[in-house]
UniProtKB/Swiss-Prot annotation:
Part of the 30S ribosomal subunit. The lineage of its organism: Bacteria, Thermotogati, Thermotogota, Thermotogae, Thermotogales. PANTHER family: 30S RIBOSOMAL PROTEIN S10 FAMILY MEMBER (PTHR11700). GO terms for biological process: translation. This is Small ribosomal subunit protein uS10. Keywords: Ribonucleoprotein, Ribosomal protein. Involved in the binding of tRNA to the ribosomes. InterPro entries: Ribosomal_uS10 (IPR001848), Ribosomal_uS10_CS (IPR018268), Ribosomal_uS10_dom (IPR027486), Ribosomal_uS10_dom_sf (IPR036838). GO terms for molecular function: structural constituent of ribosome; tRNA binding. Belongs to the universal ribosomal protein uS10 family. It comes from the Bacteria. HAMAP family: Ribosomal_uS10 (MF_00508). GO terms for cellular component: ribonucleoprotein complex; ribosome. The keyword Glycoprotein does not apply. It comes from Thermosipho melanesiensis (strain DSM 12029 / CIP 104789 / BI429).
């Protein structure tokens, strides 16, 4: 498929799991002789939640919770049908969200 590009975006709460998944995808794609660009680390989404510790008073006493979403992007240049088949067969952990754009 000349002139085509596949962009894979990975999201996860655990950065170690995310890096392992990205490494696995890159290895599989390199075995099919396609060119790979990445994994490129994208900015981490950080959401902060502040909650009162006491249900009645003591407004100065608060608890802070944080949620981080780590992201990576992989571009596959000049993919072959063999590359696409290999990508479909990869088993990734349940904590990793995969978004593929052609």
């Amino acid at each position: 498929m000349p002139g085509q590009k596949i962009r894979i975006r990975l999201k996860a709460y655990d950065h170690k799991l995310l890096d392992e998944s990205a490494k696995k995808i890159v290895e599989v794609v390199k075995q099919t002789n396609a060119k790979v660009s990445g994994p490129v680390p994208l900015p981490t989404e950080r959401t902060l939640y502040v909650v009162l510790r006491s249900p009645l008073k003591h407004k100065d006493s608060r608890e802070q919770f944080e949620k981080r979403v780590h992201k990576r992007m992989i571009d596959i240049l000049e993919p072959s049908p063999k590359t696409i088949d290999a990508l479909m067969k990869i088993n990734l952990p349940a904590g990793v969200d995969v978004e593929i754009n052609l």
